[in-house]
């Protein structure tokens, strides 16, 4: 999508590593999918909390993985 491509461009402009780019785009896509494909501008803290809780409780990801997902979401909203 155009949104994902603009995020990819922003990551590359800021010289993030390829591994970080791949990871951030994965988590942003997963976040959007989890929220029924709503545009991020139409989502807020409650959707982010629900997503992170889902990762911890249902998918049982590690704290580091949960933090990586959060960092990706923060990057998306700041850029």
Identify the role of each PLM range.
Residues 5-79:
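N-terminal core-binding DNA-recognition domain of tyrosine recombinases/integrases
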């Amino acid at each position: 999508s155009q949104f994902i491509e603009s995020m990819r461009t922003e990551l590359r402009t800021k010289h993030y590593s390829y591994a970080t780019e791949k990871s951030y785009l994965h988590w942003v896509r997963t976040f959007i999918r989890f929220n029924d494909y709503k545009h991020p501008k139409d989502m807020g803290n409650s959707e982010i909390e629900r997503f992170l809780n889902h990762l911890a409780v249902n998918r049982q990801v590690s704290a580091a993985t949960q933090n990586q997902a959060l960092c990706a979401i923060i990057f998306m909203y700041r850029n």
